[in-house]
Amino acid sequence: MSNQRVLYWPETYNNIKELGRGVSGVVYKASHKKTGQIVAIKLVDMKQSKISTEQIQGEIRALLTLNPENERTHINIIKLIQCFIHKTTAIFILEYVDGGTLEDFMYSFERGMPLSLISHCLYQSVNAIEYMNSKKCSHRDIKPANILMLRNRKPKLKQQSEQQQQEDGGYIRYSGQFQLEPSSQENNNYQFDPDELPILKVTDYGYASISGNDSAEIHSTLAGSPLYMAPEIIHIILSPFLEPGTGKLSADSSEGYNPLLVDVWAIGAVAFRLITGDDLISVIFPNLNQTTVLAALVNLAKMIDNGDFQKGLDSIPNEIRKYGLVDPDIELGISFITSLLQLDPKKRLPLKETLNHPFLAKGKLSFTQTLNQHYKDNKDVLGSIVPSDISNFLNQNQQQQQQQQKSFSTSSLPQVNHNNDTNNNNNNNNNNNNNNNNNNNNNNNNNNNNEKDKDNQSNNSSSSSSSSSPPSPTISKSSPSSLSSSLSPSSSTDDLPKAMKWSSSVKPPKKSNFAPTFLSHQRSDKITLFPKLLPPPTKDAPPLETMNWRSPPVEVGDSITWTTLTQDAIFQVQFSVLTSFLKVISASNSYQFRIITSLTKVPLEIAVSNHKDTILYMYNIVKSVIAPQLISLSNAFDENSIRSVLAAILYQIGTETEQAEIANCWTLV
């Protein structure tokens, strides 16, 4: 199977240059062949991408919600011009934002930004998030790298010949007299000018969530970047590591979090970094074990329980004052930050009130002045185009769920409740392994969502940058007239013999005396009747003799369980760990892969195989019925053998330089 990424390019656009890339896709600067309009085109390979179909659906749904057809788009929200599906490529035509990211801009200051400039930037960011929340949309990954800036609008002009192109206001004109003179920086990023403050755009909606009713839905899936992640997410997702009987931030809190409130926390964390130049967590918890992301987050979760986290939050005012900032508005800035960084989500200042906070008063004034002086004639009112294939794609999971519910309506399987991360009641497991059966050996495992590649300064609106670049994609030109929204693996059984059925085994695995450890916090009643609940094998199924289903499922008794991206709270967002495991282990048949459900109070093993391709195929079959699932790896269920496996994996990571830095000292090994 080829590891080469194949992406289809829309024929109506000229490819100017690549802006940035990540494991989820590539972003290009392009121009429309007829109009010359400059755009950013994001291409996502749905066949090999490390993100799930649900995540792509969520991003499309969020962009469509925030870019209503034939209506003016909010100035601080990235504009969606068009989106469609062609074969295995999701294509996003987005507004081209040319001034780099707020993350890049921060580094032009030695230590923190001027408070008036911070107020200007935060007012726009809060304005955008408040608008999103009014649409029942939460971003869930607010950070400086996901906030873009328009570059300066008043550069010097210089003469140019008629043969040269003119780039002005987002268009290429093929006959003209003048050309905008590039700034001193080669990339034309926004450069600080007190007479022309920047316009910001919130982007990257890969983890966005849409609530389907008037009341905010409760979520329990991990989303966001560790340095800006709200404590309720850390605490709830990692609750299995904590002592029994704990796991709630307040007496009336439920087992989940309100996604509309996590954005408020993120804004506070961003404000802290803009003022001090340092990350919140590193400052208020200087002794935190940050050897790995997992270790750091588990320790933070424990600190929430024992009260140390609250002590860290209480230290914020004094920590900010230690920077010796000489500005009369510094106390207003401290008040602004502490009103947002509240441990109890319900005590955080609502966004509507945040917009009226005294610290943002100067920002509101400067933002209004900037619009009047430099964007008064901006008449970009293009509406988003929504082809029918996108509507079909967004409804795909809902239709599948309805069919499954109809098929299993007479089953004795207990009801399992799922939280809705999208408007169409999608399961909240965020199955990042949805396409792994087509990408088992993909080497693009540096999925760092917290550190944007500096090449993404113009418009990395979609993907976290990789710490090492994936292989260049093959761009196939194709006409949008032959669009297709088929995303899922083939499930047709027309060519299969009618007698083809799953085989099963009741042989239990060997148990140990150690208690199992799982990252999933979700528990419910027993699950039985496998594999009767499963759809029949498809024509592309691996040999049935390589599959072994447990019927009924058996309890898992060994203590070490390696999880996939699907339910692993850390790796789901940041790292493609499963592929690294498979690359090392696949050469040996002595290791057994297991599919485990953590929906039950006692984890159950429901399938095993010694073949990596088979286990991934079985995994994609299982997740259509029950989620979330885990894939475990062991050798004859001997815990000691795992150590040699781990050593091999660490060696592999070291030789391939796959170690990923997540910010100041956040490292995964």
Curated annotation (Swiss-Prot):
Assigned EC number: 2.7.11.1
PROSITE patterns: PROTEIN_KINASE_ATP, PROTEIN_KINASE_DOM, PROTEIN_KINASE_ST
Record keywords, A-Z: ATP-binding, Kinase, Nucleotide-binding, Serine/threonine-protein kinase, Transferase
GO biological process terms held by the UniProt record: regulation of autophagy
One MF annotation (Gene Ontology) recorded for this entry: protein serine/threonine kinase activity
Residues of the active site: D141
Catalytic activity reported: L-seryl-[protein] + ATP = O-phospho-L-seryl-[protein] + ADP + H(+); L-threonyl-[protein] + ATP = O-phospho-L-threonyl-[protein] + ADP + H(+)
Bias (Polar residues): 406-418
Residues where ATP binds: L19, G20, R21, G22, V23, S24, G25, V26, V27, K42
Gene3D superfamilies assigned: Transferase(Phosphotransferase) domain 1 (1.10.510.10)
Region feature (Disordered): 396-518, 530-550
Keyword hit for ATP-binding: yes
Domain Protein kinase: 13-360
SUPFAM superfamilies per record: Protein kinase-like (PK-like)
Keyword Ribosomal protein among record annotations: no
Enzyme class, first EC level, given as a word: transferase
Entry's Gene Ontology cellular component terms: cytoplasm
Biased composition range(s): Low complexity: 396-405, 419-449, 457-494
Family: Belongs to the protein kinase superfamily. Ser/Thr protein kinase family.
Entry-linked PANTHER family: SERINE/THREONINE-PROTEIN KINASE UNC-51-RELATED (PTHR24348), SERINE_THREONINE-PROTEIN KINASE ATG1C (PTHR24348:SF68)
Entry protein name: Probable serine/threonine-protein kinase DDB_G0291918
Organism, scientific name: Dictyostelium discoideum
Upper classification of the organism: Eukaryota, Amoebozoa, Evosea, Eumycetozoa, Dictyostelia
